[in-house]
Amino acid sequence: MHNKIVEVLETLGIDLAFMEYEGNSNEYIIFNIYNEKSNNFADDDNLSDVYYIQINYWFKSLKNIRNYEKIKDLLKENGFMFDGAKDLKDNGYYGKNMDFIYINYKEEN
């Protein structure tokens, strides 16, 4: 799942980090999976896994405020379900915290 998130978000050309950002860019994205569970059981085997993903988009200039919509739309286009967002502010950066849900269906054998 981590690789899928990276593959999708890298296309934006914005610095990307898992859990913690150590760079010095004026805008960057941090992501993490805050919950993961098996789902849709049949014959004692799960048919899918559900991932709960947090995306934090940080930016210094308010001219970038709409980029969070690009992030949201891109993830939705790639099968992620948007589950809410809130505004952030920390250490001179503005931010947008976004939650997504992704259901990964296991392939039939």
Q: What do the predicted segments below correspond to?
A:
Residues 45-50, 71-73:
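Short intrinsically disordered coil segments
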Residues 49-61, 94-104:
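Oligomerization/assembly interface segments of phage tail-like spikes and tubes
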